Amino acid sequence: ALSMAMALSLGVSTVPVMAEDDGEPYKAALLLNGTLGDKSFYDSANAGLTALQEELGEDVFTFKVEQMGATAADEAKWEPTLYDYCDDGSYDVIICGTFQMLAALTNAANDYPDQKFIYFDEMFDYTAGGEENVYNVMYKQNEVSYLVGAMAALMTTDDSLEMVDPSNSIIGFLGGMENSVIKDFLVGYIQGAQAVNPDIQVALAYVGNFYDSAAGKDMALTQYQNGADIGFNVAGSAGLGQIEAAVDSGRYAFGVDSDQAALLPDYAANIPTSAIKNVGNSLIRAIKLDMEGELPYGTLEYMGFAEGGVELVKDAHYEEVVPEDIRTQIDEMQEQITNGEIEVQSALGENAMSEDEIQALIDSVQVG
């Protein structure tokens, strides 16, 4: 059900795609510098490819997923594993993502010019190579996190909600690592919150990785104990700790990258909604284009609300948890972002905020 919902949300074409001329199926490798089961980012990528295989059939498309692990001890095998798949020579495309794979992919793209790659969720530096064999897709997470920030700021002072203390205006943000993509989430979150409450305060913490849920829980518990009643986790598996902390504290936590309320039903009451980055759908789109010979290698594409690259889960659960007046305001903001009336500043791209501007924005909402 999740895979189908993801496919529908991006408007992915269901026009039949033909197998290759040699009769062999199109073959992809998905290399994860992490593991499945994160209920988030990597599960989204795997769900997208699984949905594509179910749609087209294994005689047309097949894929293998390699879980390389995310710990410090695992990092040493990421590049050798990538090279092993390149040496194999049987994959039409090798897929990997995140800033942690950038150096390895840059090396591989230069050493294997005939191997095609799809790189997601971090900007590829084409001045270092890859103009002919790397396709790059990123997401406008600042747009969807703007809505999350606005919703958090509206909910934190809503006296109709039992899990908030309306006497203060403190919300939380838990990041995995302090990189450009996580900063893009953060600056969108702050801008959205300030748009509805200029006096909002944001408790900010970084786990230092994307896998340590125990550390994530400890940090989130501290935020909740210090007055935050709504948090936003952008930390992969480590972010699951924030959701656990929200349950233990009787507070809220927004999900990320997948519909975490649906994936974690025991915790759903504490998860108003999730900010989804449609990784799986972007991979479906890219592979279908590649099968038709139309994927623009050497190009970076950004996907936001207008392109179907991000979304906010708005289902029956969302309608049950979030008051109608808040939902109405969020709908209006989303429409304004989509049509360009609201321009959300970003930590990424040609028009990115400077580091000084980002820090000034963070300082403007610092707790205490």
Could you say what each language-model-derived stretch is?
Residues 2, 7-17:
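C-terminal segment of classical bacterial N-terminal signal peptides
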